[in-house]
Amino acid sequence: GGTSGPGAPSEPGETPGETRVDSAGNITAAPELNDSGIAVTEIDDETLATALANAKETDGKKTVEITIPAIEGAKAYEISLPASALTSSAGDTRFVIKTDMAVVTLPGNMLAQEAAAKAKKVSLSITLVDVSQIEDEELRQLIGRRPIIQLSLRIDGEDFPWNNPDSPVRVAIPYTPTEEELANPEHITVWHIDRDAKVTPVPNGRYDEETGTVTFSITHFSWFAVVYVHKTFGDLAGVGWARKPIEVMASKGIIQGTGPDTFSPASNITRADYTVLLIRTLGLRAEFTDNFDDVKEDAYYYEAVGIAKKLGIALGDGDNRFNPEEPISRQDLMTLSARVLDKYMGLKLSDDIHVLDRFIDKGDIAEYALSGIATLVKEGLIVGSDSRISPLANTTRAEAAVFLYRVYNSYVK
């Protein structure tokens, strides 16, 4: 595998424990190395207040960068902040913690919950994990020399199992890919590894060539490993146009095959299966208490459909039925997708349906689907085939994979 690259260099003249704030509200905090090999730094109330007063707004949020210069021999960095920094209910601040192991962006409302209400101090630890700490030999081989980091949080000295679906934390790990990986950078991704060495893909994990980092967003802390996964299937010969999207989306853990070596690209995708993939692709979350009458609680798609219903993107047939096992038509797939992208991902629905004039079967599109389909065509997410949009046709698994691959690359950052 590749190696981790450089991060925040130490500057000459840094005094351990010294903290500076510049005119833009950015903090440089030189750490002190303790006896355990942890580089420790603390930001006090006064420093934080000065930084927030000077900080500039971007995207409606005040951003404070906290750079911790690298210190030789450090196996972890621990930064402590006043708890007030991360318990804002407004969510209009963020703190970018920059170390040579990882850059971690903490939203100011990540702890806006009961547990942290009386807290005084919050400490974030970023630890570089040695692969030898993983007992599973196969997993060790798969990760190789790629970086593994552990993120953890303590509140007033006590370990805190942070988990907040409403306030994702953004992570960027410096990484230098191998030649093989650079030839297929979309297959560089991220795995979450739990205490039992069970692996869960982090679907939004990807390599950013511009910054030379592997980036991902998470809603809980644990171990996270950079990995290179090239999943393929034995039945893709007839769908060359869909091979790359299928392989990339499968490698990221977003889509699965119908068997260990089969994808069944020409099979129709059901309404339930498509909803699962859409929710997983976009990483959408919601607490819900009710579901459609025909979605059973033990169904594998129960959670995804419940989330889609709660978020107002799966509307059913008006009789509180979703018809989960029915194939999804192309126009219903496009309508559902346009609705979610408009409501949650910043796409603006367009009323200009002239863009559909290029399709000879435009007249087959149902009234309710016109705006959504026109918007997706305008955005280049749907291109049609042979001057047809085929709104009434069922959607194949290959078509769904290609569409979601385009959505992923346009909207998942």
Which functions belong to the PLM regions below?
Residues 1-43, 52:
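Ser/Thr/Gly/Pro-rich low-complexity, disordered linker/stalk segments of secreted
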Residues 1-6, 15, 25-29, 142-252:
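Proteolytic cleavage junctions
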Residues 34-194:
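Proteolytic processing hotspots in large secreted/extracellular or virion-associated proteins
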Residues 61-63, 76, 92-94, 168, ...:
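A generic structural signal for beta-strand entry/edge sites
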Residues 66-68, 190, 249, 253, ...:
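Terminal processing/anchoring signals of secreted or surface-associated proteins
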